């Protein structure tokens, strides 16, 4: 457990609740004190759904601490079974209530005897894992539970090419838009979708998962454990290459073709798809990003530096797109997914100057302040950091705020996703001449000059004459001049920045 003002990944019970509320007709009960039950409000605000979030709290209060939780938890499960009639109830403690060390598994076993629905206890170590790891583990636990419960399974694969999409879930970054784009891609490839879990799926669906010819895991964060379990138990191949960016899109499609050819069962399809021709046609004529990367607009990015930070999937993919497809220098790339650090480093080692693995936002902020990139691509926290440093930021990963749960169609995966990413990259960079013209003609950019830095060091104080002189400098280089002057002043031990200090700093740099 960790006390922090900001966490990139929430506590473990949030991951369990995300999986539970993604399935249809599944109810989650969290054994928690008041204050830990904010998931309902958060999901209702961000997802903007009509339906209520199917999660309630069995509150730990002074009465529970005095007499124990068994009666309250069991009664809560039975009451929700009668009121809601769910197919499954998942009970999870929170990191706070886990301190009590109660045998909740025993409570679940007792409630299972009385209730009509299935009841399981989320088997997650709340002291060791975060939201992402817990979501991955909970999904695998639900799939395993229903497959083992079925006893006799129809393991005959479909005659036509078919796939399971695993890992689309509520509060995921643009997950629903990505799911629509994956549907379009698979339809073009004449591949039938067998199941999509957990988002919108039923808990009765997992027993049909082995009928598909392969599994597609669009994000490493959630779904990989389930795919590995299905591969071990049923020999199902899986594709875990994220179809983000033109190059990885092509690689993902080639892996899909390879996976379909793995099984000995013959494929009966209404049409034969030429995968290489499809890749060529989509890359050249459907995706606008391919020609845009060779245009004069994209060439203007030459020499620009960026910093990328996010979950392992999005940070790695965006880094490769920037460096390999758009020719933009990535000074530093990082992720807060410490558990996937080895894979992350292997993916982006040839595409950036520096790699950082951390869940400390202050450390990320210090790196951004040191590198002084032209643009940042990160989470909501990097957006806040960028605002403080007056560096533009494009949000490419969770955690994100409500503006990144758009009502419009904005996928990151697939060929339409390449267009969205190209737009995001282009619009995230500050165009120097545009800012300069806005300054000259008193455009919308009329805010005061920012003289505070992100660093906790004492910043030199600018006198009125030096502020006025700084205001005469074109805005697209003003921040750089300000930072270089302050660095010079700190190095020389100067506390007050004057016009003379500005000129001295300029001479020292030239």
UniProtKB/Swiss-Prot annotation:
Biological processes per GO annotation: light-independent chlorophyll biosynthetic process; photosynthesis, dark reaction
Major site of localization recorded for this protein: plastid
Cofactor(s), by name: [4Fe-4S] cluster
Annotated cofactor note: Binds 1 [4Fe-4S] cluster per heterodimer. The cluster is bound at the heterodimer interface by residues from both subunits.
Molecular function per GO: 4 iron, 4 sulfur cluster binding; ATP binding; metal ion binding; oxidoreductase activity, acting on iron-sulfur proteins as donors; oxidoreductase activity, acting on the CH-CH group of donors, iron-sulfur protein as acceptor
Entry's EC annotation: 1.3.7.7
InterPro entries referenced in this protein's UniProt entry, alphabetically: ChlB/BchB/BchZ, LI-POR_suB-like_C, Nase/OxRdtase_comp1, P-CP_red_C, Protochl_reductB, Protochlorophyllide_Rdtase
Active site: 297
Binding site for substrate: 432-433
Location of this chain's protein in the cell: Plastid, Chloroplast
Substrates-to-products reaction catalysed: chlorophyllide a + oxidized 2[4Fe-4S]-[ferredoxin] + 2 ADP + 2 phosphate = protochlorophyllide a + reduced 2[4Fe-4S]-[ferredoxin] + 2 ATP + 2 H2O
UniProt KW keywords: 4Fe-4S, ATP-binding, Chlorophyll biosynthesis, Chloroplast, Iron, Iron-sulfur, Metal-binding, Nucleotide-binding, Oxidoreductase, Photosynthesis, Plastid
Pfam families: Oxidored_nitro, PCP_red
Enzyme class: oxidoreductase
Keyword Metal-binding on entry: yes
Binding locations of [4Fe-4S] cluster: 36
One Gene Ontology cellular component annotation held by this UniProt entry: chloroplast
Complexes and interactors: Protochlorophyllide reductase is composed of three subunits; ChlL, ChlN and ChlB. Forms a heterotetramer of two ChlB and two ChlN subunits.
Record function comment: Component of the dark-operative protochlorophyllide reductase (DPOR) that uses Mg-ATP and reduced ferredoxin to reduce ring D of protochlorophyllide (Pchlide) to form chlorophyllide a (Chlide). This reaction is light-independent. The NB-protein (ChlN-ChlB) is the catalytic component of the complex.
Record's protein name: Light-independent protochlorophyllide reductase subunit B
Organism from which the protein derives: Pinus thunbergii (Japanese black pine)
Primary gene name: chlB
């Amino acid at each position: 457990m960790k006390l922090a003002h900001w966490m990139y990944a929430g506590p473990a019970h949030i991951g369990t609740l995300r999986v539970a509320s993604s399935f249809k007709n599944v109810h989650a009960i969290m054994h928690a004190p008041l204050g830990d039950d904010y998931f309902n409000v958060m999901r209702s605000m961000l997802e903007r759904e009509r339906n209520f979030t199917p999660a309630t709290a069995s509150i730990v209060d002074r009465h529970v601490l005095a007499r124990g939780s068994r009666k309250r938890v069991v009664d809560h499960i039975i009451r929700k079974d009668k009121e809601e009639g769910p197919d499954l109830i998942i009970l999870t403690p929170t990191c706070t209530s886990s301190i009590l060390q109660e045998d909740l598994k025993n409570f679940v076993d007792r409630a299972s005897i009385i209730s009509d629905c299935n009841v399981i206890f989320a088997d997650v170590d709340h002291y060791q894992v975060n939201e992402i790891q817990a979501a991955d583990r909970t999904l695998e636990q639900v799939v395993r539970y229903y497959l083992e419960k079925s006893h006799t399974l129809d393991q005959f694969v479909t005659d036509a090419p078919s796939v399971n999409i695993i890992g689309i879930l509520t509060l995921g970054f643009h997950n629903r838009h990505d799911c629509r784009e994956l549907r379009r891609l698979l339809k073009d490839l004449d591949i039938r979708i067998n199941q999509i879990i957990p988002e919108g799926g039923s808990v009765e669906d997992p027993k049909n998962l082995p009928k598909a010819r392969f599994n597609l895991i669009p994000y490493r964060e959630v779904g990989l454990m389930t795919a590995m379990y299905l591969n071990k138990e049923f020999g199902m191949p899986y594709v875990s290459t994220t179809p983000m960016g033109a190059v990885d899109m092509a690689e993902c499609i080639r892996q899909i073709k390879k996976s379909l050819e793995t099984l000995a069962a013959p494929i009966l399809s209404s049409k034969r798809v030429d995968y290489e021709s499809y890749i060529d046609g989509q890359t050249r004529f459907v995706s606008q990003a391919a020609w845009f990367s060779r245009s004069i607009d994209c060439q203007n990015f030459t020499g620009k530096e960026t910093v990328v930070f996010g979950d392992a999937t999005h940070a790695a993919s965006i880094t490769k797109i920037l460096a390999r497809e758009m020719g933009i220098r990535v000074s530093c790339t990082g992720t807060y997914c410490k558990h996937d650090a080895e894979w992350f480093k292997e993916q982006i080692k040839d595409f950036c100057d520096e790699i950082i693995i951390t869940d400390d936002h202050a450390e990320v902020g210090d790196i951004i302040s040191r590198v002084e990139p032209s643009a940042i691509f990160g989470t909501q926290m990097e957006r806040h950091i960028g605002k403080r440093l007056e560096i533009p930021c494009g949000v490419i990963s969770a955690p994100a705020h409500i503006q990144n749960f758009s009502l419009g169609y904005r996928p990151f995966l697939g060929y339409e996703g390449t267009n969205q990413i190209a737009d995001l990259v282009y619009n995230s960079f500050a165009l120097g001449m545009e800012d300069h013209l806005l300054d000259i003609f008193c455009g919308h950019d009329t805010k005061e000059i920012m003289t505070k830095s992100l660093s906790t060091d004492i910043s030199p104080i600018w006198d009125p004459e030096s502020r006025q002189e700084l205001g005469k400098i074109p805005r697209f280089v003003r921040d750089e001049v300000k930072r270089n002057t302050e660095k010079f002043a700190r190095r020389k031990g100067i506390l007050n920045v004057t016009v003379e200090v500005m000129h001295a700093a300029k001479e020292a740099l030239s």
